[in-house]
Structure formats: structure tokens, C-alpha cells
């Protein structure tokens, strides 16, 4: 894609938010599958575990990567208002194996959750956060300094895995006045085992 920000009006967002609540939607239960912790902790295979929304644990024998970590109840700057989680994450932070790298795709609250990154930084001493251009300052303002900021097409190699930040069509914002002030994108992973992308 061109990487150009997708423009949509705030009125459309409000309309969608109102209409989705006013519809009489059928509710149903989900069966939650318990992760195979033995396989996760041994890390002898290529394993991807979906934790919830865009949070995935990717393991390839050499490295453990967590994408867009979100473990809290709301995707919002407020802990009492905003979009609420319907299902608990498939894993808790305390259940995670050692995490080498966390990738952040963009600054929206459902992809960059302050409490989640804070708890991860406290739990794992050597964790590295890979973030889009412009977000390092946010992390440092929260006391998290092991952060590497990447522009589109920037790459680095971590434990024999080539990680590249690639453009996608989206946008970024955490408030009313910071639209597209930080970059957004996807992460491409390539190593001797395989290649995949997290959008």
C-alpha cells in the first residue's frame, strides 16, 4: 500500500458507535481454549499464540515476540470509560514466557496500552520495544527506555530474525490533536524457519 493515512470523519465514528449499541444483537458464549503452556515454555517449535485482539505471542526457537500487547479491560485513556473488553485475554502477563521483543504497530489505545507495556517492562528486564517513528518519546515519558524507533522499511536483526517495519494504509492518534504525528505500520519477520507479517 501507499502508506497514506486513511481519512474518516469524527461524525462517522460517533454514528457507528451509537448504531452498534442500539442494534439488538444476539449474544453467545465463546469457548476459550487454554494455551499449551508446555509447548510455549519449552519453545522448541515455531508457535504463534493468539492472546486477544492484535496481541500475539510469536516464538521461533530463537526469539519470543509479543505484538501490540493489550491485557487491560479498556482501550481508552480512562480506566472507567471507553471500549471495554468482552473476553479476557487468552494469557495473563504472569503466564508469559520470557519476552525478548515487543512490537507496536501504531498509537491507538487498543494497540498501545500503557498499563500493559508498563507491566511488561517491569517483568522482563531486557525486553526491547520496537515502535514506529515518533513513539519513542511517549515510552521515555513513561520511564521505559529500552526502545528502538523505526521508520518504514527500517530493519534490524535480533537473534537471527530480520524484523522490518513496513507501511500499511492506516493512521495514528491518541488524542484529538495528535493525528498522524507518529507513524503506523506492520512488522515483517524473516528467519531460517519462515517469513510472516503482523498487520
Can you annotate each of these PLM segments?
Residues 58, 68, 106, 129, ...:
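Divalent metal-coordination and catalytic microenvironments
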Residues 44, 54, 125, 152, ...:
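Residue-level marker for the onset of beta-strands and adjacent loop->beta junctions
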Amino acid at each position: 500500500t501507499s502508506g497514506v493515512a486513511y481519512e474518516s470523519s469524527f461524525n462517522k465514528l460517533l454514528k457507528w458507535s451509537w448504531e452498534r449499541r442500539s442494534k439488538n444483537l444476539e449474544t453467545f458464549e465463546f469457548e476459550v481454549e487454554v494455551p499449551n503452556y508446555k509447548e510455549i515454555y519449552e519453545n522448541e517449535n515455531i508457535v504463534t499464540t493468539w492472546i486477544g485482539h492484535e496481541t500475539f505471542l510469536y516464538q521461533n526457537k530463537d526469539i519470543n515476540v509479543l505484538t501490540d500487547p493489550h491485557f487491560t479491560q479498556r482501550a481508552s485513556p480512562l480506566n472507567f470509560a471507553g471500549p471495554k473488553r468482552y473476553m479476557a485475554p487468552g494469557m495473563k502477563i504472569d503466564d508469559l514466557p520470557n519476552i525478548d521483543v515487543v512490537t507496536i504497530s501504531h498509537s491507538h489505545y487498543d494497540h498501545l496500552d500503557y498499563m500493559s507495556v508498563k507491566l511488561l517492562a517491569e517483568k522482563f528486564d531486557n525486553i526491547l520495544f520496537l515502535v514506529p517513528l515518533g513513539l519513542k518519546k511517549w515510552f521515555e515519558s513513561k520511564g521505559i527506555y529500552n526502545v528502538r524507533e523505526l521508520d518504514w522499511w527500517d530493519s534490524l536483526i535480533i537473534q537471527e530474525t530480520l524484523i522490518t517495519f513496513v507501511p500499511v494504509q492506516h493512521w495514528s492518534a491518541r488524542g484529538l490533536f495528535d493525528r498522524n504525528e507518529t507513524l503506523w505500520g506492520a512488522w515483517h519477520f524473516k528467519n531460517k524457519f519462515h517469513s510472516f507479517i503482523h498487520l
